[in-house]
Amino acid sequence: MKKKLALGILLLSAITVVAQQENDSIRKTKFKFNGGLESNAQWYLNDVERKIDQPESPLRSNNYLFLKANYGNFTVGTQVESYYKEALLNYNPAFEGTDFSLYWANYRSKILDITAGYFYEQFGSGMLLRAWEDRALGINTALRGGRINFKPTDGVSITALYGRQKSGFHVSDADVFGANADLDLATLFKQDSFGLTAGFSYILKNAEIDESVVDPKFDKETPAYSGRVGFSKGGFYAATEYNYKGEEPIYQPTTGLDYDFIKPGNALLVNLGYSQKGLGIDATLRRMENMSFLSDREPFVYQSNGDQLATNSLDYNDRVLSFTPALTKQHHSNLANIYVYQAQNRVNIDVTTNINKTGEIGGQFDVFYNFKKGSPLGGKYGTKVALNVSNWFNLDADFEFEDENGAYKPDYDAKFLGGGEKYFSDYNIEVSKKFSKNFRGNFMFINQYYNDRLIKGSFIENVVKTNILFAEGIYTFSGSRSLTVGAEHMWADNDRKNWASLLVEYNHNMNWSVFVMDMYNYGFEEEGNLIDDAYDLFKIHFYNAGITYRKNSSRFSLGYGRQRGGLVCAGGVCRFVPPSTGLSFTISTSF
Amino acid sequence: MKKIALLLLFVSTAALAQKELPNLNLKSLDNKSVNIKSDFNEKDKVYVYVFWATWCAPCIQELDAINDVYPDWQEELNMEVIAVSIDDARTGKRVKPLVNGRSWEYNVLLDTNQDLKRSLSIANPPYTIVVKNGAIVFEQAGHAPGSEHDFFKKLKSL
């Protein structure tokens, strides 16, 4: 009944959206209503050449209807989600059917903000607590409970919350309590010549201990806290944040939850920079040790189903409280997104593969510079240059594997400063230049180092070193018409070796655009040590074409093509997608 | 449950109210709390909110292109661009150096956990919202290179 109702609302509201947009009349009412609709559909097809059979339900869609009603200081809202007939391939199995996914009621005044129901939140940089949504990645880790935010005066913000973390249409079992204070000290003490901020967070996770555990050596409550300060003066700024996670048993994908392997975790983040008009310099350094903070003690397991192997919630970045993204540049180039670094926040001690890691240490460095108009390198329109470097290493640590009787008993001691083996590095430079009134270009060179064995914990020694060249030209004709051509090539010394890619996009006006693109992989040995050798063991064109129509707040697009199997990343988190071929259709609108 | 559904249905069919920005505070680049509604409410002034991210190439293209003609636009029309970054903790530290490094003249706000983006049901950046006298008078999903001229004509007509 509930599900049918939800589906009915979804459909009727979709019709209403269209109807509403026809009506331009503006009425002055105090009562406000708005929302949005998003639908991502795929029709998976057989691809004989790639030996891919369409799944049992080939037509799948993820649909989201968001509704919000506001009257003065009060707002109520809901989100209905429908996965019809099933969610898109490799989405979290917790997304199933049609139902109310979120609902909340909120009161907000200048000093008070109270929410009951589902809410999103982030404390500090989110390394201990971030409840967020990313539909493309199938992430929705909202908390269900209550939250109060209090701003007694300018420069003070205090939050207290309680909730259980959402997973699909359910919530996890553990209770999460949190408190946070952010102080803008410069404002509080009426100082204009510099900026000074401080913040503190406390989180308590209460998860039951399985009855089978005799005399547990840990508490069912895990505390975590963090502190941060920021300072700025003129163009200079500096900030640091320290996070500490209390002792809890460690979960490892290979050995599961080990009730005798109990460790705390911590993370340190330092950010320094200088910027003025035309120049920006920034350095971000981070060290993380055992910083995976789950909302339950261990990931929720989804049994194997048909041709789908057993997976767990961690595979979908679900039931996770901490947000520890990779601090690397998120590239616009297609080929630079094949070997993507994922931040290493977990402990892994594995005697079979001899891959032992406890976290990561490293940093990212950026320089942005604008060569002014009229200068020798700036030319008539100026030249913009962006340099980015990132390097990430395993922590330097001593490991133990056995107790005095020779039984498996892992332990480690990680040094505070000191890097171990390198996980990943990325050195890149990007130049954007306007050549004439109608023509502009972007050029990029990217050099990456990707240590697959260490990052993924596999047996096979597989370090991939790549060099990528990317060039893009945009020519605009009169009347908002434009043509974009992007070409790139990647030289890789290992795995699937070389790739070439070409993209052509034509924008007819503000409303219509079409694109065709192809990615071609060549030069590899079929017998070589391929990272993912299950599919596409031949020289293959990954072609795609699509058409988009945009009007006001709505966007419709239709596409056809081949999806490479692998990681699809957005906002610093990646989702594994299986190889597929098919038609895609997306709608998004807000009202 | 049924009652709630009926209520929602009623609401979704009956309400055709004027659309406004939600009453939310965001942080500016110098860490000041800014109300996106009450701090941008000069009578008859045109406020252009561009939602963007450091990883969104078309967004940067759009903001670069507007930046080139921004002084001319401001001379001809009482208008202001507010560039709302939806970068999260992964790329958020790159916002300030990028904005300065590209010599952007905009008022930049940070929607770090994407509360404003979500509240307005924005699916993907770039996304542009034009506000005049408290009401949302124009919205545009996406960006077409070279459409700045047409966009400015639109702004003048609002």
Q: Model segments located where?
A:
Chain A
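Well-ordered mid-protein domain cores that form the structural environment of catalytic cofactors
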Residues: 103-152, 158
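Predominantly transmembrane beta-strands of Gram-negative outer membrane beta-barrel pores used
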Residues: 64-70, 104, 147, 180
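Signature for the C-terminal beta-barrel architecture of outer-membrane proteins
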Residues: 25-32, 42-60, 76, 85-89, ...
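Post-signal peptide N-terminal segment of secreted/secretory-pathway proteins
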Residues: 70-113
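Bacterial Sec-dependent N-terminal signal peptides
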Residues: 1-33, 590-591
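A mature extracytoplasmic/lumenal domain signature
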Residues: 80-82, 118-120, 287
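Beta-strand-dominated lipid-handling architectures at cellular/organellar boundaries
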Residues: 20, 36-39, 230
